[in-house]
């Protein structure tokens, strides 16, 4: 096969202008003989990455509300169940160990620290998958794809079923917390671990509630949002409003968002990564253009 577009370099044996200077125009055609060579260059066949095309196609249109990709499967529910069971086991060890050792304040303070740091942890993870990697990234590729879709159609998260939305985090919690449950009996450690893991496991649900209208939320959730214990819609709106610079990544309580945004912590991290590795975050370009 040859390309329809051919490179045709023109090569002349003699300089044309001196030959024709003193010759009548009517005789020029018989003397203007040029040797023309055609170079036929085979076209290089393009083999697009079919898998990439399929993945990108998913981001073209929002899925309908009854799309199976938004529904929970049995596997999703099993992972959520495993994650919740693991967190409960850690919490039980904290309570039982605290009463057995006659220490209650320390596990409670450790739990509070876990709650506060879980918000920070959710922000760091949210920032990472929003800005780096793609669908082919090991372990978190599907979450990165979902995050990109979320920035195109934020309202989709309100119709995504709980197990579908949280199973990936529940799986991670199961693998990380279960060894601690089996190996450690310290009530203070489990006070921190159980609260941190609980907040991380449910942070995507907190995120979904922050996109929902108050009229559709349970009264207790609205009360917690108004008290600042859970991320509210008013707090989270900045994350989707600033198209050139993402903000408000933390999605448990949002308590860290002002600190991180005012001090431009994530912007500093992005610059460091760019200088060191030459990788630009997606926040440096319009996310809706992807």
Task: Show which residues each predicted segment covers.
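Cytosolic/stromal cytosol-facing helical appendages immediately following the last transmembrane segment
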Residues: 2-74, 132, 136-139, 152-163, ...
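Transmembrane alpha-helices of multi-pass eukaryotic membrane proteins
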Residues: 76-81, 105-112, 190-196
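Core segments of transmembrane alpha-helices
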Residues: 82-88, 163-181
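N-terminal membrane-targeting hydrophobic helices
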Residues: 89, 102, 113, 117, ...
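Helix-coil boundary and interhelical linker segments in multi-pass alpha-helical membrane proteins
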Residues: 91-109, 179-192
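Hydrophobic alpha-helical membrane-embedded segments
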Residues: 105-134, 199-208
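Extended non-transmembrane interhelical loops and adjacent amphipathic helices
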Residues: 142-148
């Amino acid at each position: 096969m040859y390309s329809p577009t051919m490179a045709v370099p023109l090569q002349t044996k003699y300089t044309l202008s001196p030959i024709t200077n003193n010759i009548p125009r009517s005789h020029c055609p018989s003397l203007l003989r040029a040797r023309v060579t055609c170079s036929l260059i085979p076209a290089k066949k393009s083999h697009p990455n079919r898998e990439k095309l399929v993945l990108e196609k998913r981001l073209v249109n929002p899925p309908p509300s009854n799309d199976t990709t938004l529904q929970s499967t049995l596997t999703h529910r099993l992972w959520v169940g495993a994650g919740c069971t693991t967190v409960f086991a850690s919490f039980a060890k904290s309570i039982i160990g605290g009463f057995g050792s006659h220490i209650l304040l320390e596990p409670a303070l450790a739990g509070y620290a876990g709650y506060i740091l879980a918000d920070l942890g959710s922000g760091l993870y949210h920032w990472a998958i929003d800005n780096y990697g793609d669908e082919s990234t090991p372990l978190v590729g599907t979450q990165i794809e979902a995050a990109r879709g979320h920035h195109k159609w934020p309202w989709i998260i309100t119709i995504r079923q709980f197990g579908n939305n949280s199973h990936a985090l529940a799986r991670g919690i199961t693998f990380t917390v279960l060894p601690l449950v089996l190996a450690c009996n310290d009530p203070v450690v489990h006070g921190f671990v159980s609260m941190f893991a609980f907040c991380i496991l449910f942070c995507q649900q907190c995120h979904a509630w922050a996109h929902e209208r108050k009229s559709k939320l349970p009264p207790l959730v609205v009360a917690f949002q108004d008290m600042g214990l859970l991320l509210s819609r008013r707090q989270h709106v900045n994350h989707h409003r600033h198209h050139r610079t993402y903000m408000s990544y933390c999605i448990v309580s949002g308590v860290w968002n002002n600190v991180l945004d005012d001090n431009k912590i994530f912007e500093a991290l992005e610059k460091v990564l760019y200088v060191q590795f030459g990788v630009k975050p997606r926040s440096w370009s319009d996310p809706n253009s992807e």
